[in-house]
């Protein structure tokens, strides 16, 4: 443990067996348990960072937004690695980078469709990119790649 950090991966239920909001609820419950039992886990509660890649990045952001809305606690920071933030697939990078790469537009959309089921893609927890309530979140670090269909961000 050279960094002095403890890494805890929260497991969450997956689609298609478990649809929206199962994964969101699991992520929120998981971080609440970690925060509540931080001392027992050898974790400094003031340094808890939420991080995730792809769907995990999505869950990290929405979990922080839920914690903020509930007025409980906020993580020290968020690290979102090529996060899935737009279930509407309306950004240009979905079209320009959505074919001929490992992760295609259709692959991303089928994942959203399985998870969201009857929930609209415009739901604030399904497409957090379009939300307006980011004020008050901790610092957010977003990592993405040039040819990633998830690259574009709202300006």
Located regions from the model:
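Alpha/beta-hydrolase superfamily serine-hydrolase fold, recognizing
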Residues: 1-153
